[in-house]
């Protein structure tokens, strides 16, 4: 019975190992048998200690494997490991003798299939959208006519050729190309650096700062376009102070940079069409605006001319304005002379009955005093009447002087209106300065033709045809009566002015006889 509890005797042919020797042997076998392997599984229990190394598990429904990614390699992984993500890890198998377990040293990692990529893409899109990077309020309008366009794409391939060809056909512009890798590990950092690099260019520097950016790439699979879904690219596009057009892939391809860009183009060619207008269409629009401008200028001149003619017809003649007051003056002057005679006769009639009752000496004294008083009043009345007549004459002369230059002021107003119209046309022409030089030259010719027309309609052109302007004391004379009353005439011909004196003076009007004595 005691033999049942005794250990069997070891075979003399079975080797004996220490724990370290056996662990080392297992390590060598695993590392030699499984070199570089690719393992598919779900990530679980992710740990990131202060050392910078990355520890996590790879598992499926039946087994779990430990995985390690050293610090130097963890920063270069194309996918950031997150718990629950299904990935394909590439690395080398080894063991950890201290705990007697095997593990994989991960060198690279990628999502396992399109489904995993789409799940990760949707999760990243939701996180960035929650930060407000895709808000419509952040998007800027594209410049109407950019002088410099920056293109971020591969320097070779059909994409850049299509963009340059389309820009050349529509509106040739200055294009700066920032060459980048459009797929692979270098794609995301190079694209982000290019966007930020264009934004750091100073205004007025040796390299012109773009007014518009285009990030372009041709079509491809989800994996090929993955670089444009990276967070650094999306943030660079959202932070760009220069308006940006995303033209990545075909119309059915959508990347995260499309949401962050100010505009999304379905193709690189469509991006070029969004960037610049068609030059021929601009020229056609400019022709139409120039024609409308010419019609507007002609209509303005026609309305001003018609207004001047209407004012000239509505202005009364000088003779009709002066005729009424002059007739009233003559009437009152005649009545005044008759009233004086009647007043003297009435006083004489009152004095004659009294003379019979008065002594001669007393009567003579009374008559002398009355005569003196009457003489004083007569002289005062004559002085007053003279001053009133002089003031009335001065008022009539002033009225005549104000009305005589009326036509001259109308002519001056016409010239000022023409100058204002010319200035308006000049301002409108200056606003069109950015248009092509050929169109500007044609507009300038039209403006010069209008200016020549203005000069032709001026009175100086009329002087060249044999007419003359007659002035007296700086005022324009329009009637024979005004010319006959002037002492000196100034005649303006087309080549200068000539002063002319009258050959004989008009005989002055005789003064009325003084009031005689009553006795």
UniProtKB/Swiss-Prot annotation:
Alphabetized GO MF terms: exodeoxyribonuclease VII activity; nucleic acid binding
Main location: cytoplasm
Single biological process term from Gene Ontology: DNA catabolic process
Record-linked InterPro entries: Exonuc_VII_L, Exonuc_VII_lsu_C, OB-fold_nuc-bd_dom
The protein's Enzyme Commission number: 3.1.11.6
Region (Disordered): 500-519
CDD domains in the cross-refs: ExoVII_LU_OBF (cd04489)
Entry similarity comment: Belongs to the XseA family.
Assembly information from the UniProt record: Heterooligomer composed of large and small subunits.
Identification of the protein by name: Exodeoxyribonuclease 7 large subunit
